[in-house]
């Protein structure tokens, strides 16, 4: 029997486990899917916006994999760090270990004032409204009148949409009670989404963009002069010597052009505005009374080579809440090699490289392998590549002498694993919490609540 540990139960971890079951070269495989949290699914549970039910429904296909009898979910197990299992110890327990630990850190803006109260990463905000147990309980300045979201990807659009969406609509989702109450009493009326380049370089998808325009009681505001600055905006179909833009960019430009030329009529009792801004590079977060009060942007313009240059002009945008959404990056896992320049673990076709040499029995998949790129489905092919390497190495790996019962060894080392039955208990507790509040399922947002629920103890 080939015993494999997969560290991380998000999409990359589950797809890795699935690929191990689907391959035929090593018929007898047993997989333990370990996670630091007592809950599975990673960013599908804690990163997908609560109003995106279709994407969240992906949990059912991940669940089907984790319920296979050859797979054991082992939550609430720390790997690396103080009190955690070291990679060296995991190699003693399993023939192979695949690290699928994602890229949890956010990229900073690296500008003065970034650490002022009222300035947060989008990751912190998403974790809060997604009920991640590590999230700060509160502190988001939702009494603010104006918010700035720095970044023009789907995460930026997500957080802007949640800020602008009414509590009545979010009530139908699994947003935790405290976040729902806070968002319901939010005074944010203006949300600025700002990017340093033009609309043709924006990373959001057209579907996400259109959702903003469909929000009830929200008006989209786009400055046509900022669109006109972008050379690609003028001729999206291309021309002599100029290739046509990708279809998604052309569709985005059409949506933005529509909002700028034919702004939708102001709905009755207009409450909120989302302003799409381009060619603005943040240079400083402004302070007043010890808190963030705005963002100073340098105005940029196309440099003719796909980038931007500063124009020498500046613009201050008032904001009492600033959320940065300029990308994720991986963080080092103690005991594993790490490439700080790329925020990834060095590898060759998924095999972990130590000092340039493949380390037997150690593998990576997902964002910690390739960086935070692609969509959820991109993890499937990434996992298959890694599993192909592992299976190729399996004849040597399976000769290794490993512990007969890794779970017992985990408990003996002081870990208190939450297995699949414990997760099902958490699901039941969240359904009951929702019923008690007259809602659908509502997430439990704290460690003690999750662990009590996993043990079947009442809240």
Explain the meaning of each model-derived region:
Residues 96, 100-107, 153-154, 319-332:
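Glycine-/small-residue-rich beta->alpha transition segments that form the dinucleotide
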């Amino acid at each position: 029997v080939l015993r494999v540990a997969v560290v991380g139960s998000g999409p990359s971890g589950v797809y890795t486990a699935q690929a191990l079951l689907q391959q035929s070269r090593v018929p007898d495989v047993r997989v333990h899917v370990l996670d630091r949290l007592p809950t599975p699914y990673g960013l599908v549970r804690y990163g997908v916006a609560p109003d995106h039910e279709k994407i969240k429904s992906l949990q059912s296909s991940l669940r089907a994999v984790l319920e296979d009898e050859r797979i054991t979910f082992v939550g609430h197990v720390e790997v690396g760090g103080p009190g955690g299992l070291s990679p060296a110890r995991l190699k003693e327990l399993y023939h192979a270990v695949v690290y699928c630990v994602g890229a949890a850190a956010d990229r900073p803006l690296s500008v003065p004032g970034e650490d002022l109260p009222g300035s947060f990463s989008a990751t912190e905000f998403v974790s809060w409204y997604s009920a991640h147990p590590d999230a700060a309980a509160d502190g988001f300045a939702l009494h603010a009148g104006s918010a700035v979201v720095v970044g023009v990807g789907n995460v930026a659009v997500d957080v802007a949409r949640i800020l602008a969406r009414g509590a009545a609509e979010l009530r139908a989702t699994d947003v935790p009670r405290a976040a729902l109450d806070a968002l319901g009493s939010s005074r944010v009326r203006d949300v600025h989404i700002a990017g340093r380049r033009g609309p043709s370089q924006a990373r959001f998808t057209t579907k996400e963009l259109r959702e903003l325009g469909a929000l009830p009681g929200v008006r989209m505001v786009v400055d046509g002069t900022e669109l006109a600055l972008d050379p690609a905006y003028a001729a999206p179909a291309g021309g002599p010597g100029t290739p046509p833009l990708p279809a998604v960019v052309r569709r985005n430009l059409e949506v933005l052009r529509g909002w700028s030329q034919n702004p939708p009529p102001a709905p009755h009792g207009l409450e909120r505005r989302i302003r799409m801004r381009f060619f603005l590079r943040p240079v400083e977060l402004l302070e007043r009374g010890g808190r963030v009060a705005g963002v100073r942007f340098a105005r940029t313009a196309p440099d003719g080579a796909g980038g931007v240059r500063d124009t020498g002009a500046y613009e201050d945008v008032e904001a009492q809440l600033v959320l940065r959404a300029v990308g994720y990056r991986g963080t080092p896992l103690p005991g594993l090699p790490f490439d700080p320049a790329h925020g990834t673990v060095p590898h060759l076709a998924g095999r972990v490289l130590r000092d340039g040499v493949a380390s037997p029995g150690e593998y990576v998949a997902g964002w910690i392998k390739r960086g935070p790129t692609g969509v959820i489905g991109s993890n499937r092919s990434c996992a298959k590549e890694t599993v192909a390497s592992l299976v190729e190495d399996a004849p040597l790996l399976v000769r290794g002498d490993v512990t007969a019962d890794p779970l017992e060894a985990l408990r003996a080392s002081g870990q208190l694993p939450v297995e699949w039955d414990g997760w099902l208990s958490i699901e039941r507790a969240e359904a009951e919490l929702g019923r008690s509040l007259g809602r659908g399922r509502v997430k439990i947002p704290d460690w003690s609540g999750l662990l009590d629920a996993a043990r079947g103890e009442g809240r």
